Amino acid sequence: MSDSSKEKKKKFADMVSRQKGDDQQSDNHKQTDDLNEDLNTLKERAVQLEDHLRRAVADNENVKRIMQKQISDASDYAVTKLARDMIDSCDNLKRVMEILKDGDPVHEGIKVAYQKIINDLKKHGIEEVDPLGELFDSNLHQAVVEREDNEKKPGTIVEVLQTGYTIKNRLLRPAMVILSKKSADCGSD
């Protein structure tokens, strides 16, 4: 074989070798691109899953908080029906005490029983609303009638007909009240 044919053969072999290398490089680039694309897809999916997980955890915390509030409210206000019955009994005891005279042993016994019931109600978050002298508040009071009284600001509670009650700062029964108003002839002076 001549040198020129050896040279041609060598050039041809180099060219084939380069093409194989280029093809291999091209395949490697394609595989790398495919792997990068797969990696990016997986990263996006991981971000989506993390977001879903965060939302699920937040939803779970919200549900837990709501349930705890409902349980707390249920225990706080479970005594509401009993409390309403008890305050009716307190009203009856008050009426009896108003009829009986101070110093009467029955009056004193009823007074002690009444005070015991009121103290027990307080232990459970039930408080009396005695708004005498305060301004009328429709959230806590029920106006029954207005009475002329030029000495007090209009809308001031001048008499409490029935004591109101709250349970843990929530109205159980409004106080029934009489309000002051200016007399009709007061405005003509």
Swiss-Prot record:
Family matches, as InterPro entries: GrpE (IPR000740), GrpE_coiled_coil (IPR013805), GrpE_head (IPR009012)
Keywords attached to this entry: Chaperone, Cytoplasm, Stress response
Compartmental location: Cytoplasm
Biased composition (Basic and acidic residues): 17-33
Region listing for Disordered, in residue ranges: 1-37
Gene Ontology cellular-component annotations: cytoplasm
GO molecular function, one term: protein-folding chaperone binding
GO biological process, one term: protein folding
One Pfam family in the UniProt entry: GrpE
Function: Participates actively in the response to hyperosmotic and heat shock by preventing the aggregation of stress-denatured proteins, in association with DnaK and GrpE. It is the nucleotide exchange factor for DnaK and may function as a thermosensor. Unfolded proteins bind initially to DnaJ; upon interaction with the DnaJ-bound protein, DnaK hydrolyzes its bound ATP, resulting in the formation of a stable complex. GrpE releases ADP from DnaK; ATP binding to DnaK triggers the release of the substrate protein, thus completing the reaction cycle.
Assigned protein family: Belongs to the GrpE family.
Quaternary context: Homodimer.
Protein name: Protein GrpE
